[in-house]
C-alpha cells in the first residue's frame, strides 16, 4: 500500500523524519510530498526542500520525495495512493487533522488518513520553532537533520 506524507517541510525536522521512518515500516511506499503553501513565506524553495529531504531519507529504500501543487487527494489519485500519513503532536493538531481528513473524504471517498503520534522527544517541535531559534543564533542541530541545519545556518549567516 502506498502512503502520501504531505507537508510544506520548511524545514523538515527530526519529528518529520521520525514519522517518515515509522511510516516506512507500515507501508510499502511512502511518498513525501512537498506542497506549496500560498499562506506561508518559505525559507527555502520547493526544489531545495525536495533536495534536502531526499538527502536525509536516502537510507530509506521505500521512500520517495516529490512536489505537487494542488489538492493532496488529487495527487494521491495520480500516484495510486489510498492513505495520507499525518503526524500528531498535540490535541490541537488532532482537531485540525481530523477536520482535514473528513474534508478529504468528501473530495474522494477512496482516501484514508492514518495518524501517527509524534515521538515524545519531538512533541514540542515545529518548523516555525526551528526558524525562530536559528534566526536568533541558537543551535538547531538537535532539531533537524545535519544537512538541513547546515543550510539554515548558511541562510541566517
Swiss-Prot record:
<feature type="binding site">
    <location>
        <position position="86"/>
    </location>
    <ligand>
        <name>substrate</name>
    </ligand>
</feature>
<feature type="binding site">
    <location>
        <position position="16"/>
    </location>
    <ligand>
        <name>ATP</name>
    </ligand>
</feature>
<feature type="binding site">
    <location>
        <position position="72"/>
    </location>
    <ligand>
        <name>substrate</name>
    </ligand>
</feature>
<dbReference type="InterPro" id="IPR001980">
    <property type="entry name" value="PPAT"/>
</dbReference>
<comment type="similarity">
    <text>Belongs to the bacterial CoaD family.</text>
</comment>
<feature type="binding site">
    <location>
        <position position="40"/>
    </location>
    <ligand>
        <name>substrate</name>
    </ligand>
</feature>
<dbReference type="GO" id="GO:0004595">
    <property type="term" value="F:pantetheine-phosphate adenylyltransferase activity"/>
</dbReference>
<dbReference type="GO" id="GO:0015937">
    <property type="term" value="P:coenzyme A biosynthetic process"/>
</dbReference>
<keyword id="KW-0963">Cytoplasm</keyword>
<comment type="function">
    <text>Reversibly transfers an adenylyl group from ATP to 4'-phosphopantetheine, yielding dephospho-CoA (dPCoA) and pyrophosphate.</text>
</comment>
<comment type="subunit">
    <text>Homohexamer.</text>
</comment>
<feature type="binding site">
    <location>
        <position position="97"/>
    </location>
    <ligand>
        <name>ATP</name>
    </ligand>
</feature>
<feature type="binding site">
    <location>
        <begin position="8"/>
        <end position="9"/>
    </location>
    <ligand>
        <name>ATP</name>
    </ligand>
</feature>
<dbReference type="GO" id="GO:0005524">
    <property type="term" value="F:ATP binding"/>
</dbReference>
<dbReference type="Pfam" id="PF01467">
    <property type="entry name" value="CTP_transf_like"/>
</dbReference>
<feature type="binding site">
    <location>
        <begin position="122"/>
        <end position="128"/>
    </location>
    <ligand>
        <name>ATP</name>
    </ligand>
</feature>
<keyword id="KW-0548">Nucleotidyltransferase</keyword>
<protein>
    <recommendedName>
        <fullName>Phosphopantetheine adenylyltransferase</fullName>
        <ecNumber>2.7.7.3</ecNumber>
    </recommendedName>
</protein>
<dbReference type="InterPro" id="IPR014729">
    <property type="entry name" value="Rossmann-like_a/b/a_fold"/>
</dbReference>
<keyword id="KW-0067">ATP-binding</keyword>
<keyword id="KW-0547">Nucleotide-binding</keyword>
<feature type="binding site">
    <location>
        <begin position="87"/>
        <end position="89"/>
    </location>
    <ligand>
        <name>ATP</name>
    </ligand>
</feature>
<feature type="binding site">
    <location>
        <position position="8"/>
    </location>
    <ligand>
        <name>substrate</name>
    </ligand>
</feature>
<dbReference type="GO" id="GO:0005737">
    <property type="term" value="C:cytoplasm"/>
</dbReference>
<comment type="pathway">
    <text>Cofactor biosynthesis; coenzyme A biosynthesis; CoA from (R)-pantothenate: step 4/5.</text>
</comment>
<keyword id="KW-0173">Coenzyme A biosynthesis</keyword>
<keyword id="KW-0808">Transferase</keyword>
<feature type="site" description="Transition state stabilizer">
    <location>
        <position position="16"/>
    </location>
</feature>
<dbReference type="InterPro" id="IPR004821">
    <property type="entry name" value="Cyt_trans-like"/>
</dbReference>
<keyword id="KW-0460">Magnesium</keyword>
Amino acid at each position: 500500500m502506498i502512503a502520501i506524507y504531505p507537508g510544506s517541510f520548511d524545514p523538515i525536522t527530526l519529528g518529520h523524519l521520525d514519522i517518515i521512518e515509522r511510516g516506512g515500516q507500515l507501508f510499502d511506499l511512502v511518498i513525501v510530498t512537498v506542497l506549496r503553501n500560498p499562506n506561508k513565506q518559505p525559507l527555502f524553495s520547493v526544489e531545495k526542500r525536495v533536495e534536502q529531504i531526499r538527502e536525509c531519507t536516502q537510507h530509506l529504500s521505500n521512500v520517495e520525495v516529490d512536489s505537487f501543487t494542488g489538492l493532496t487527494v488529487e495527487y494521491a489519485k495520480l500516484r495510486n495512493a489510498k492513505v495520507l500519513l499525518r503526524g500528531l503532536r498535540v490535541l490541537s493538531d488532532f482537531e485540525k487533522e481530523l477536520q482535514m481528513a473528513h474534508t478529504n473524504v468528501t473530495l474522494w471517498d477512496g482516501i484514508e488518513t492514518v495518524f501517527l503520534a509524534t515521538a515524545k522527544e519531538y512533541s514540542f517541535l515545529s518548523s516555525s520553532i526551528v526558524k525562530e531559534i536559528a534566526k536568533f543564533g541558537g543551535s538547531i542541530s538537535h532539531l533537524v537533520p545535519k544537512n538541513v541545519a547546515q543550510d539554515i545556518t548558511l541562510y541566517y549567516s
